[in-house]
From Swiss-Prot:
This is DNA-directed RNA polymerase subunit alpha, chloroplastic. It comes from Physcomitrium patens. Its EC number is 2.7.7.6. Pfam families: RNA_pol_A_bac, RNA_pol_A_CTD, RNA_pol_L. Keywords: Chloroplast, DNA-directed RNA polymerase, Nucleotidyltransferase, Plastid, Transcription, Transferase, Transit peptide. Residues 1-77 form a transit peptide. The gene is rpoA. Its main location: plastid. Residues 374-450 are annotated as: Alpha C-terminal domain (alpha-CTD). GO terms for biological process: DNA-templated transcription. In plastids the minimal PEP RNA polymerase catalytic core is composed of four subunits: alpha, beta, beta', and beta''. When a (nuclear-encoded) sigma factor is associated with the core the holoenzyme is formed, which can initiate transcription.
Length: 450
């Protein structure tokens, strides 16, 4: 740091500043800020600035006062060697020396405090897709980077995301197949190269994208000779096959193959109830996992001296029914769903003085504005599709522009019933979902209107 400034040198600088401000005229009076570039262009000012070590000079909005000193209205922003830009009031000449010492002591303390806070604070996490590849219709790859983490945090997030990607992300699969004129899964079918068991294995590997949470029906009705592929399946609008060329069977003669498929949505792997199989209806071990594999790695780096941070890399392979980025978003939302119960406030008992009745309302209905704001921040990021309500109720909410749980809490039960095509059963489904996942009840009508 430069040597301590003399009182006379500081006084010279202050006088130059005053003279420069007066020369700026009306513009300086209208605005509380002036340009350091304008001031430095004045004769004699640069020399004073260089002697004092003041490398930046401008008026600023924040004010610092030194106790016990007489201060004048002139405000100077000083950047002493090695210090941050700080605003202080320039005192009269006789107090310059004391002001300088106090300023330096205060500035030194502020620097130490700022550096400590900077080293302890966590910057906002940022994520980016650094690589993506479509290696085939049924194999998509994506690589993502997330940073900055404090030491140890990246591994925690990596383990959680890997497990959520493999076990929590929903996908669609064939759960049951009903063959026409077939009694046993091992019986040979005339004009069909494969046995029913072989066809069931092929159906198990079908990659299907579903936009509905409800079970769906699909039909295979093909006439030979020739191959039967996924593109031959008659699907409802909510279903789509990822790879239409995926093989199902081969018909060697001019015969028909008729199969009815049950398509469901779920997570992970589910064993079919084979004890119910019979009379041409066969249950399949369903693989709902759209994520084929997920890996993560953690790399450390120094963001600044003695401050170590981490970057997390996530690698995701999907079967093509969803993209790796969609899988990443869904896994994160699943983790949020798992942790939300820990954030639920306890119910408060509120007395209705008009009716002398005690009713229990959630904090989302009656509480302080601060608590309400904190709660709404959480629920603004929870979308209504995460309530896992029937598609009819979900579609009605979307048409009413109710996208999040926070939006939903603005409505009473009577308000919901006034939405077109929204019946009592849909309201009951929503009430059940809100109570199960968030311990929230919607009032029948606005209690403030009673």
């Amino acid at each position: 740091m430069a040597a301590v400034m003399s009182a006379q040198a500081m006084a010279d600088a202050v006088r130059v500043v005053r003279a420069s401000i007066s020369e700026l005229g009306k513009s300086a009076k209208k605005s509380d800020a002036f340009s350091a570039r304008d001031l430095k262009s004045r004769s004699g000012f640069t020399e004073s600035v260089d002697r004092l070590g003041l490398v930046n000079l401008q008026v600023q909005a924040r004010k610092k006062r030194v106790r016990g000193l007489r201060l004048v209205p002139t405000r100077v922003v000083s950047a002493i060697e090695g210090s941050n830009s700080t605003t202080a009031d320039a005192p009269v000449d006789e107090d310059v020396l004391a002001w300088t010492k106090a300023y330096r002591a205060e500035n030194s303390t502020a620097i130490t405090r700022d550096e400590t806070l900077k080293s302890n604070a966590q910057s906002a996490l940022q994520w980016k897709c650094v690589e993506t590849q479509v290696e085939g219709e049924r194999l998509h790859y994506g690589r993502f980077a997330v940073s900055p983490f404090r030491s140890g945090q990246a591994n925690t997030v990596g383990v959680s995301m890997q497990k959520a990607l493999l076990g929590e992300v929903e996908g669609a699969a064939v759960s049951c197949a009903t063959f026409k004129n077939v009694k046993s899964e091992y019986a040979a079918m005339k004009g069909v190269e494969e046995t029913p068991m072989d066809i069931l294995v092929n159906l198990k590997e079908l990659v299907i994208r579903s936009d509905s949470d409800e079970p769906q029906k699909a039909i295979i009705s093909a006439i030979g000779p020739g191959p039967v592929t996924a593109g031959d399946i008659v699907l409802p609008p909510s279903l789509e096959v990822t790879d239409p060329t995926q093989h199902i069977a081969y018909l060697t003669k001019e015969v028909s193959l008729d199969i009815e498929l049950d398509v469901e949505k779920g997570c992970g792997y589910r064993m079919g109830d084979h004890t119910k199989s019979g009379d041409g209806r066969f249950y399949i071990d369903s693989v709902f996992m759209p994520v084929r594999n997920a890996n993560y790695s953690v790399h450390s780096y120094e963001s600044e001296p003695d401050v170590t941070q981490e970057i997390l890399f996530l690698e995701i392979w999907t079967n093509g029914s969803i993209t790796p980025e969609e899988a990443l978003h869904e896994a994160a939302r699943c983790l949020i769903d798992l942790f939300l119960p820990f954030l639920h406030p306890k119910k408060k008992e509120v007395t209705n003085s008009a009716t002398k009745m005690h009713k229990s309302f959630t904090m989302s209905q009656f509480n302080s504005s601060a608590e309400m704001s904190a709660k709404e921040v959480d629920l603004r990021h929870v979308y209504v599709d995460q309530l896992r309500i029937p598609s009819k109720a979900y579609n009605s909410l979307k048409r009413a522009n109710i996208n999040t749980v926070s939006d939903l809490l603005d409505y009473t039960q009577d308000d919901l019933l006034s939405i077109p095509n929204f019946g009592r059963k849909s309201v009951d489904d929503i009430l059940e979902a809100l109570q199960a996942q968030f311990s929230i009840d919607l009032p029948e009508n606005n209690p403030l209107c009673n």
